Amino acid sequence: MSDKIGRIIAKMDECGVKFVRLQFVDIHGKPKNMAIPLVRPDQIEDIIKDGLLFDGSSVEGFVDINESDLVLKPDPDTFSTLPWRPEEKGVCRFICDIYWPDGKPFEGDPRYVLKRALDKYAHLGYEYNVGPEPEFFILDQDEDGNIIPHDCGAYFDVEPVDQGTDFRRKLVMDLEALNFDVEVSHHEVAPGQHEIDFKFDKALKTADAVITFKQAIKAIVDKIGYMVTFMPKPFFGENGSGMHCHQSLFKDGENVFYDPDTETQLSEEALYFIGGLLKHAPALTAVCAPTVNSYKRLVPGYEAPVYIAYGLKNRSTLIRIPASRGKGTRVELRMPDPSCNPYLAFAAMLEAGMNGIQNKIDPGEPTEIDVYEKSMSELREMGIETLPSSLWEAYHALEEDDVIKGALGGHVYEKFMEIKHREWDDYRVRVFKYELERYLDI
């Protein structure tokens, strides 16, 4: 028995653990889990070693019924109790990796997709870090049953206008109990909208954290009688929810993006990484903004990125370079939203950026104007293109991008495209209230 497993068993015994949740995500990033009754604490050693068989054909995006057997193996580094369920101290959780019965990694496991990309560049000495900024809405219902924001607060408001203060405090405390390093929490721009940021970390740990973060929020809000949504654009005329992703590369403990001897203090690698993100932005959008609703957020006028450009401290461009330098030097990609699968999104972002470094893709000069104030003809003269304006455009861009397809791998790419084609066709044929209001009197 390893020391790590020994410490886990001791902690489980201390907490009186009676059930172990084995958790993973489907192709959408939606958490799934199995609960195992624990007869004795050292039983977990066998579970970690041998895993547990499950039916993968019942999970969207995994396997067909004729090859349904898959194996869940807990990652010991993800052990935690669930602080938002204090009445059930006897429950712990592991995030799992998925394997075929012969011991080979299952290529349709989103967590494996990210681990594969990270391992590829770890061999070259690179460590990829991500710091996400997920936004979300807390919702209520009016007397007619309509979904409404739970408050009328705006950016950085305080109580009583901001009615989410106590909720955010509770959530931050629970996240810290899960070893999150929370940096800040606040009310966002739209009524009922909030943001909690946690410090950047290694990409795999961060992706695990995003899944846990969303799960914790939904559990806590449900207990106080409200709803929470990570839907990108739940209300017309209001800002949508994004998940801006701050990214950096480290090598031998040093930030690869930092060069104190250049005018901007950005290294060549940083600029090439930006160049890769810009080049592959249309295909990246399919993975990082993966729903039909995502594209109702990505429109001018609501602080969401639309134009494929980068700037220093410029929040109107797709990519922003925050002012921090040294170990804090980073690139902020502003198009992702919290409906994305973080494992797939981080893998795709890493491959896009590294493709830029490997091929020395020059991003050009930074854009320091407010691009929202320019016409399309002016932007085209400047060489600035737009992101896809619909899921249909985005998945067609993905079809043409071998780098992002390669990041996903053949299995995930094919399943992802099947699902997105169905999603678009289902959306395309529906008749909405707007159409009845606009065209019924024809």
Curated annotation (Swiss-Prot):
Cofactor, free-text remark: Binds 2 Mg(2+) ions per subunit.
Descriptive protein name: Glutamine synthetase
Positions contributing to L-glutamate binding: N239, G240, R297, E303, R315, R334
Domain of life the protein comes from: Archaea
GO cellular component terms given for this protein: cytoplasm; membrane
Localization per record: Cytoplasm
Biological source species: Methanothermobacter thermautotrophicus (strain ATCC 29096 / DSM 1053 / JCM 10044 / NBRC 100330 / Delta H) (Methanobacterium thermoautotrophicum)
UniProt-listed Pfam families: Gln-synt_C, Gln-synt_N
Keyword terms, alphabetized: ATP-binding, Cytoplasm, Ligase, Magnesium, Metal-binding, Nucleotide-binding
Residues the record lists as binding ATP: E183, H246, Q247, S248, R315, R320, K327
GO terms of biological process kind: glutamine biosynthetic process
